[in-house]
Regions:
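Signature of N-terminal electron-transfer/Fe-S-associated modules in redox systems
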Residues: 1-159
Length: 159
């Protein structure tokens, strides 16, 4: 069960957009931006407040790839595996990140909630391959070594 402050913040977000069905997506976006994921309890709550069925709210949330029902780390690292990045060895970059962070195909977020590593189909920066993003900031021409250096830089920011 979520703390009451989650519901208070959600009420503020709903009030900002107006309690109407057309506000569903921007409300969900703001909730996810606030908590780094979309808590299922809040999605049910939002549905009841704006007049959509719970099924409708969940169908929208699961349709769009950017919504997540699992908490993500402070730094979301997306490793591109599009054709250009793949042939330029993006997967060794991802493997180095996963190994360094103690992650696996089933575990994408570190226990300290600092890092989440995901694979995406294309970041649209093919000329800079292989690329990854950290919180949507593009990092071009990555190597496993550069990726580890980047992790260490990010770790330094959190001290």
């Amino acid at each position: 069960m979520l703390d009451l402050s989650y519901y208070a913040k959600t009420d503020e977000i709903i009030e900002h957009y107006g309690p109407k069905p057309a506000s569903l997506i921007p409300i969900m976006q703001d909730i996810q931006a606030e908590y780094r994921y979309l808590p299922g309890e809040l999605l049910t709550y939002v549905a009841s407040k704006i007049g959509v069925t719970e099924a409708k709210a969940y169908s929208v949330a699961t349709f769009y790839e950017n919504f997540s029902f699992e908490p993500k780390g402070k730094y979301v690292i997306k490793v591109c595996d599009g054709t250009a990045c793949h042939v330029r060895k993006s997967m060794p970059v991802k493997e180095a990140l996963m190994k360094e962070l103690g992650l696996s195909n089933k575990k994408h977020t570190t226990d300290d909630m600092l890092f989440t590593v995901e694979t995406v189909s294309c970041l649209g920066a093919c000329g800079l391959a292989p690329t990854l993003t950290v919180n949507d900031e593009v990092h071009p021409k990555m190597t496993p070594e550069k990726a580890i250096d980047l992790l260490n830089e990010l770790r330094g920011e959190t001290v």
